[in-house]
Amino acid sequence: MKKEISKIVGENLKLARKAKGLTQTQLAKELNKYQSDYSEYESGIIQLDYEKIVYLCERLDITPNDLFGIDN
């Protein structure tokens, strides 16, 4: 279950990033991470912590529900 959620979050993160015209490298720098680390967020390998979820939702103009694939 945890792995499935990480994959959903990663896919939605990638879609939102691309919709904003941003690169993995750009967002990685904003998070003080390497691009390879950021790539693992989008691949669902590394889970995001609370602060990164909040930052990325605000930065990408999405809600946590959007990120987690939850329909209202």
Give residue ranges: language-model regions.
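Short amphipathic helical patch at the helix-1/turn junction of helix-turn-helix
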Residues: 7, 18-19, 47
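A detector for short, charged/polar N-terminal pre-domain segments
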Residues: 1-8
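Conserved hydrophobic/aromatic packing and binding residues within compact polymer-binding modules
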Residues: 13, 27-28, 38-41, 67
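Recognition helix of helix-turn-helix/homeodomain-like DNA-binding domains
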Residues: 32-47
